Amino acid sequence: MTTNKKNILILSAGRRVELVQDFQAEAAKFSDGIKVLATDLNPRMSPACHVADGAFSVPPISAENYIDSIFDLALEQNIGLIIPTIDTELQKLADARRRFEEAGIHIIISDSELVTICRDKRFTASLFNRCDIATPEIYERENLTFPCFAKPYDGSRSIGAKYIHTAEDLSYDMLKDPKIIFCQYIDITNEFTEFTVDLYYDRSGRLKCAVPRERLEVRTGEVSKGATRRNGLYTLLIDKMSHLEGARGCITAQFFCKGSTVYGIEINPRFGGGFPLTYAAGGNYPGWLIREYLYGEKIPFFDEWENNLIMLRYDAKVLVHEK
């Protein structure tokens, strides 16, 4: 299925300069003059919006008219491809996906049911288990084992997560908060290695590429130093997650590994912050999305990405001349 609408819209662009640039690099390979546009609550203060071919202010994601504003903007700007980037907009977009599809606009978002599973870490654990991938045990709060790890079941970027060494570290508020779950503690400082995997699923939920990235250093929840690794985790995922019902586009999954022991931790049905490393290694997800959704092409399985490619991030700037 092709669409006459060719422009691309990256939502909540914020600081995602590299993601915008990756899409621009791929869009430039086509002869249709594809533009890569961006939205933000305050585009004037968004570096990615200044790098994009055009930028637009939209209401907060929590606003009732958020979806309507995105829909109207997409029609106005000839948008054929919409790329979500943050967790809090995913469910709304998944629920509205068919409305956009009927207008020839493709939101790269997984089915609503899968997004619901991914947004709740309790359900995510069950999904991993159905794929025959182990997960850290989730304890009943009346029967905790120490040390353990506490985190909100709908949290992201490690916000609200806390290591609990003994019962003395527990607070009343933590125990009474219905969103906090208590999990088996996995030592990623001394024993296990943390990986994020960028998985590309076609529109039928078939896995077309998987690139594991070792998280060498993390800053405020986002990888600052990472390396691609073709390892046992890669082999496992090609076998166990070759099909994921309802998955679509880039899916970012987190794992803790030690030898042949693998724990699935979470799944985010969107581009992750460390995706530019996968793109640099040859995982051309932006180009594949353009080909699959704007031009109706089939995407073949790809495993020729560069192994052991290291990414070392640094702070950069965008200068804006005020008028």
Please identify what each model-predicted range represents:
Residues 128, 136-140, 144-161, 178-190, ...:
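ATP-grasp fold ATP-binding core
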Residues 45-52, 141-146, 172-176:
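Short loop/helix-cap segments at secondary-structure boundaries that form the rim of catalytic
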Residues 101, 105, 113-137:
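Glycine-/Pro-rich loop/turn segments that contact NAD(P) or position catalytic residues
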